Amino acid sequence: MTTGLPSQTQVIELLGGEFARAGYEIEDVVIDHRARPPRITVVADGDTTLDLDTIAVLSRSASSLLDSLDNIGDSYVLEVSSPGIDRPLTSEKHFRRARGPKVELTLADGSQLTGRIGALQSGSLDLVVRAGREWKVREIPLAEVEKAVVQVEFSPPNPAELELATTGRAAGTEVEA
């Protein structure tokens, strides 16, 4: 049985330009033919946070473009969303966009580090880590990062730690390679 839904590639080709004009790129498209009504999920990300107002605008544009297809069918659910906090950071752009949050890294040697994402430069990530009572920046080559997951925080970060992550400098800090 066919639902008349477009393929993942067709959705990306159809919506990609509209999302790019808004400053976002399509990270993934999931088409669930088994759901009733069928569901098309578009996951987008950009250098600025995908807020609810932007999601609404993108959803209206995407819905209009999808509805213009001849074979789309009468009923489907469209969902436009961001990747979510639990998405692993897998590319340089993910780290660049995630500057500031706390992250747990697993390195190629099996060691684990938890720190705050700082600047990304020349294939390396600045990670703000605790060094006794102070904060320091540790430079981590991206090639050594096996896994990186942003951590959910329930309390505000230390101001000095956050300043170091977002500006790259704070009083009483040093950079370690």
UniProtKB/Swiss-Prot annotation:
Gene3D superfamilies: RimP-like superfamily, N-terminal (3.30.300.70). InterPro entries: Ribosome_maturation_RimP, RimP_C, RimP_C_sf, RimP_N, RimP_N_sf. This is Ribosome maturation factor RimP. SUPFAM superfamilies: YhbC-like, C-terminal domain (SSF74942), YhbC-like, N-terminal domain (SSF75420). Belongs to the RimP family. Keywords: Cytoplasm, Ribosome biogenesis. Required for maturation of 30S ribosomal subunits. It holds the Pfam family RimP_N. One of its GO terms (cellular component) is cytosol. Disulfide bonds: none annotated. One of its GO terms (biological process) is ribosomal small subunit assembly. The keyword Cytoplasm applies. Its main location: cytoplasm. It is found in: Cytoplasm.
